[in-house]
A protein has these predicted regions:
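Flavin-binding catalytic cores
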Residues: 190, 213, 217-222, 227-274
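Short beta-strand to alpha-helix junction loop
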Residues: 56-62, 85-110, 238-249
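Glycine-rich FAD pyrophosphate-binding loop
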Residues: 5-7, 18-45
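A conserved short coil-to-beta-strand element within the FAD-binding core of flavoproteins
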Residues: 119-134
């Protein structure tokens, strides 16, 4: 029986797994096709890809800054420079933006490269049996661990492990904000020296020019377009039913804002993140080795 079951291979799960693996046996389970969680990377063709979730990391605390700088020394991350335009003209301190060397999911890949990870493995039930956990997977298999660490979004964590959580944890009510993202490939468009644009708009909040991350060279322009909180909240539960409709709305709005013509799009894909991030800081109280 292994010591730790980690649910989720995002940055949080990967960091925890790497640290625990120094002195314990660890195994990771993730419902996705690959590592990364919110820092996932979507491949288009060959080495052309989109960071369609987390766009970059900008450390605020000294401890996290040192952690990221160490990853930079190991060539797991690099700096995303050039021009980042803010059309909202908000006053914010200039900060260094770090990205994964081969996609933002490369951060997780690097951290868990020596740890057994199971993808397409959804944890459907957890049960504590005296001194170990029984984990049921989507294929009905059961696996057994001494300790359990859940790094999934809080609403999912709460649903999965409710009866084992303390009242203090159950009463935590983080405001999870959704995000709707469109990935688009443009042909015959100028390669602008702009890395990202923050818009003052009701539909589109932000867009990243993937070419400027210098992971590939292409005549095609790849843009990741992320919508506003208001637009995302309104439409997150209906985009699956009519993806083409919402892709068109967002791409036409992007055309109006930038001049990039929707008719020049040769690939487009929409993705909805139901639990993209927390709106406000929430005091977290939990034991990262056991839930009881």
């Amino acid at each position: 029986m292994k010591d730790f079951c980690i649910v989720g291979s995002g940055i949080a799960g990967s960091v925890i797994a790497k640290e625990l693996a120094k002195e314990n046996s660890v195994e990771i389970f993730d419902k996705a096709k690959g590592p990364g969680g919110r820092s996932s990377n979507r491949r288009y063709k060959d080495n052309l890809s989109f960071d369609h979730g987390l766009q970059y990391i900008s450390p605020k605390s000294n401890k996290f800054r040192k952690f990221i700088q160490n990853l930079e020394k190991k060539k797991a991350v690099t700096r995303w420079e050039n021009n980042h335009l803010d059309l909202t003209f908000e006053k914010k301190e200039t900060s260094i933006k770090y990205i994964g060397n081969r996609g933002n999911n490369y951060i997780s890949k690097y951290l868990i490269k020596n740890i057994k990870t199971n993808y397409k493995s959804t944890v459907t039930n957890v049960k504590f049996n005296s001194n170990y956990w029984v984990i049921t997977l989507n294929n009905k298999d059961k696996v057994f661990f001494r300790n359990l660490v859940l790094t999934c979004p809080f609403p999912q964590l709460k649903k999965l492990s409710y009866k084992y959580l303390t009242k203090e944890i159950v009463n935590i009510n983080p405001q999870m904000v959704p995000n709707i993202t469109v990935m688009a490939v443009y042909k015959d468009c100028a390669q602008l020296p702009i890395s990202s644009i923050k818009f003052d708009d009701s539909v589109i909040a932000w867009a990243a020019h993937e070419n400027t991350k210098k992971r590939f060279i292409s005549r095609k322009s790849l843009w990741t377009i992320q919508c506003t909180e208001k637009f995302s909240k309104k439409n997150i539960n209906v985009i699956r039913k009519n993806k083409k409709k919402y892709e068109k709305i967002i791409l036409k709005k992007f055309e109006a804002l930038t001049g990039f013509q929707a008719k020049k799009v040769i690939f487009q894909n929409i993705h909805g993140w139901k639990y993209a991030y927390k709106k406000k800081k929430t005091r977290a109280i939990y034991n990262c080795t056991k839930l009881i």
